[in-house]
């Protein structure tokens, strides 16, 4: 990847942080990466990648349709990366049964999705 132009997300973006951590774990310094664009819009990033102007890192779900329709090709990173997700609720306020039930459901659903992803 080092020899190819990289289309990065804007600073502070979660995917950018995951990409930075991936490169760091692989022993690739930021100065070794050929940055060709730094954008806040995922749609713009996908358009640049589809036009052949560089490669980008995006979540599987964010590019699913583009891959399915043949505009982009996805190459899984090795080792795999994961986006940590958390359910957020008010800190010191009363939590209704509905909020608690939703939080429990969301956690179960995220776990199910992670299992499916590992099996794929």
Per-region residue spans from a language model:
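A broadly tuned preference for mixed-charge, low-complexity surface segments
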Residues: 6, 61-68, 103-118
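Hydrophobic hinge/microswitch elements
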Residues: 12, 20-24, 28-72
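A general structural signal for well-ordered alpha-helical segments in protein cores
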Residues: 15-16, 20, 45, 85, ...
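A late-sequence structural motif
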Residues: 53, 73-116
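Secondary-structure junction motif
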Residues: 5-27, 96, 113-118
């Amino acid at each position: 990847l080092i020899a190819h132009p990289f289309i990065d997300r804007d600073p502070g973006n979660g995917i950018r942080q995951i990409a930075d951590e991936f490169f760091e774990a692989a022993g690739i310094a930021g100065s070794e990466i050929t940055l060709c664009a730094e954008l806040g819009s995922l749609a713009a990033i996908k358009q640049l990648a589809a036009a052949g102007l560089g490669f980008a890192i995006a979540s599987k779900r964010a590019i699913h349709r583009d891959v399915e329709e043949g505009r982009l090709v996805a190459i899984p990173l090795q080792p795999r990366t994961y986006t940590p997700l958390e359910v957020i609720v008010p800190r010191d306020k009363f939590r209704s049964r509905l909020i608690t039930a939703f939080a429990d459901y969301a956690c179960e659903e995220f776990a199910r999705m992670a299992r499916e992803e590992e099996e794929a």
